[in-house]
Regions:
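Catalytic Walker B motif of ABC-type/P-loop ATPase nucleotide-binding domains
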Residues: 81-84
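A short, proline-enriched helix->beta-strand linker immediately N-terminal to the Walker B motif
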Residues: 75-79
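ABC ATPase nucleotide-binding domain "signature" region
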Residues: 61-62, 68-73, 97, 112
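C-terminal portion of ABC ATPase nucleotide-binding domains
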Residues: 44-48, 100, 121-168
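ABC ATPase nucleotide-binding domain helical subdomain, centered on the C-loop/LSGGQ "ABC signature"
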Residues: 14-55, 99-100, 107, 167
């Protein structure tokens, strides 16, 4: 599970990522980092995977922490991954890259809990909750055509924006 606010420990980036898979070699770690777009900032750090993290990852931004936690989850080789608003601190362009990379993990079931419609638009199924209960289940296209709650959320989030969530 990857949460909106995850835990990072004092130690190196490598040590933190190996909590996901203690046997992972650097090649495997970098592959997970690329999928989570963590390579984008790690490659600019002088010590890369050996960069020391403060307790809680306080020397990283919120988005950087989230990307490391996504990479750590990917290293676990789980059959089911739960992403609970795990890209909320990531800009939309980076989130789009992460979504595209996660699509390559075809044998992994991904449950995405999100507030941004762009996070779920291209998923197989979207479950709309209302007052803690399942309101409707469908694809983006089905819900946009038939569900007033989804239509309202979509309209409010897409107003003024041009991110259609597509995987160009």
């Amino acid at each position: 599970i990857t949460l909106q606010k995850n835990v990072l420990f004092s130690g190196t980036v490598r040590e933190n990522l190996k909590w996901g898979n203690s046997l992972a070699d650097d090649e495997t770690i970098w592959k997970a980092c690329r999928a989570a777009c963590a390579d984008e900032f790690l490659s600019r750090m002088p010590d890369g995977l050996d960069t020391m993290l403060e307790q809680g990852g306080n020397n990283l931004s919120g988005g950087q922490k989230q990307r490391l936690c996504i990479a750590r989850a990917l290293l676990g080789n789980a059959k089911i991954l739960i992403f609970d608003d795990s890209t909320s601190a990531v800009d939309t362009a980076t989130e789009k890259k992460i979504r595209k990379a996660l699509a390559d993990y075809k044998d992994v079931t991904k449950i995405i809990i999100a507030q941004r419609i762009t996070s779920v638009m291209n998923t197989d199924q979207i479950v709309i909750l209302d007052d803690g209960k399942i309101h409707r289940v469908g694809t983006h296209k089905e819900l946009l055509a038939n569900d007033p709650i989804y239509q309202e959320i979509y309209a409010s989030q897409m107003k003024g924006g041009n991110d259609n969530g597509s995987e160009e």
